[in-house]
């Protein structure tokens, strides 16, 4: 049984002249967040029901289409019902309602009709009252047939409220919200949610360099989240700077190359954070994400080549050995839990480790250190990865 989503996007907000759907949230609009949450829960299609399409809403819908979300825009309940198979499960998202991904997935997995609830106390009239002790949190699951039946008798009633009432009449389960939920109506409602979204936009698997650069990455993300610049553009800038760094090293411009490398490192992190903020999970498979490791490896080899003129050809060998250990470390660590993995060698961190050696003119010693660091990290990861199974067999 497939999962579809129905998002209401027609109520006026508490802000003059603005729909709830177009309230700005984390650099985009509320309806974009809702649609991406529905997509992350596995919904296809995602039907957005509208009464009018002001420019802000039209722009938001176009951005969603560009990102290839399975979007259907319906202007009437009948159009929405036609877009959804009667045998599909339907995730109903009220106008302005948001929750985290885990709650949506959990609700979508419930068999039969279910509504997400919050306590009556502490929540205002914007949360529809269900009974004497609970209110609707703005999320529910029903079946497509119920939507078709409701569309046929709707007349002038509000679709989301009528669908909720009919689901309750059929005996829908009440499921208490286990995490933060909100129905947003004013600009002032967005501050806390936006803070949580920003705090949660940390890329998974960040090493020690990611922790050190986190404040700079967060600041860059905050500056760019409301701009037209997307993760692809910022990632492209990072890859371009890394490629230019390799070219600078090749010509012997060591400080120029290192400066470009250092500048590229927070941009990469900011691109990943912005992608997570906008729920664009495919950014790690972008072409620039594949170019970055290649350009970084080229920069390391180019540095060895530049140093070979004064330190001998062993510098090039050191660069290739360091690269080999880094690749082996990645293979050895893939899918495994390694103790102290945050301290192991990583591509972005190695650029910053060269900085103190460069300040004292010890570039050759820095390259030797990076090679030793990569080797030590690999052997530690190998020991951790293979000692645990051996201990379990004993």
Description of each model-found segment:
Residues 21-34:
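Short catalytic helix/loop segments, enriched in acidic residues and glycine
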Residues 52-104, 221:
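Short phosphate-binding loop-to-helix
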């Amino acid at each position: 049984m497939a999962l579809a989503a129905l998002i209401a996007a027609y109520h006026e907000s508490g802000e003059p002249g603005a729909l709830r759907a177009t309230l700005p949230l984390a650099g985009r609009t509320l309806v974009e967040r809702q649609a991406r949450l529905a997509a992350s829960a596995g919904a296809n299609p995602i039907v957005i029901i509208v009464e009018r399409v002001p420019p802000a809403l039209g722009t938001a819908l176009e951005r969603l289409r560009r990102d290839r979300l399975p979007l259907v825009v319906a202007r009437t309940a009948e159009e929405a019902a036609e877009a959804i198979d009667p045998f599909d499960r339907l995730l109903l998202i009220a106008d302005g309602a948001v929750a985290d991904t885990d709650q949506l997935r959990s609700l979508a997995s419930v068999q039969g009709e279910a509504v997400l609830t919050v306590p009556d106390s502490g929540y205002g009239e914007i949360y529809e009252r269900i009974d004497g002790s609970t209110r609707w949190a703005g999320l529910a699951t029903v079946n497509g047939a119920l939507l078709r039946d409701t569309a046929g008798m709707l007349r002038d009633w509000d679709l989301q409220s009528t669908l909720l009432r009919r689901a309750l009449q059929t005996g829908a389960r009440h499921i208490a919200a286990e995490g933060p939920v909100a129905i947003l109506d004013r600009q002032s409602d967005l501050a806390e949610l936006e803070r949580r979204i920003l705090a949660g936009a940390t890329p998974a698997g960040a090493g020690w360099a990611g922790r050190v650069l986190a404040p700079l990455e967060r600041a860059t993300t905050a500056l760019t989240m409301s701009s037209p610049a997307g993760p692809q553009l910022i990632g492209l800038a990072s890859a371009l700077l890394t490629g230019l760094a390799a070219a600078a090293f090749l010509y012997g411009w060591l400080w120029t190359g290192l400066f470009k490398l250092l500048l590229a490192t927070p941009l990469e992190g900011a691109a990943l954070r912005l992608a997570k903020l906008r729920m664009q999970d495919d950014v790690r498979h972008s072409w620039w994400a594949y170019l970055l490791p290649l350009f970084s490896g080229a920069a390391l080899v180019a540095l060895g080549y530049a140093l070979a003129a004064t330190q001998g050809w062993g510098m090039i060998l050191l660069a290739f050995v360091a690269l080999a250990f880094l690749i082996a470390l990645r293979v050895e660590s893939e899918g495994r839990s390694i103790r102290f993995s945050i301290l192991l060698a990583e591509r972005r961190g190695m650029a910053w480790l060269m900085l103190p050696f460069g300040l004292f003119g010890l570039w050759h010693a820095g390259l030797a250190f990076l090679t030793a660091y990569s080797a030590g990290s690999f052997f530690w990861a190998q020991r951790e990865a293979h000692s645990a199974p051996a201990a379990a067999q004993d």
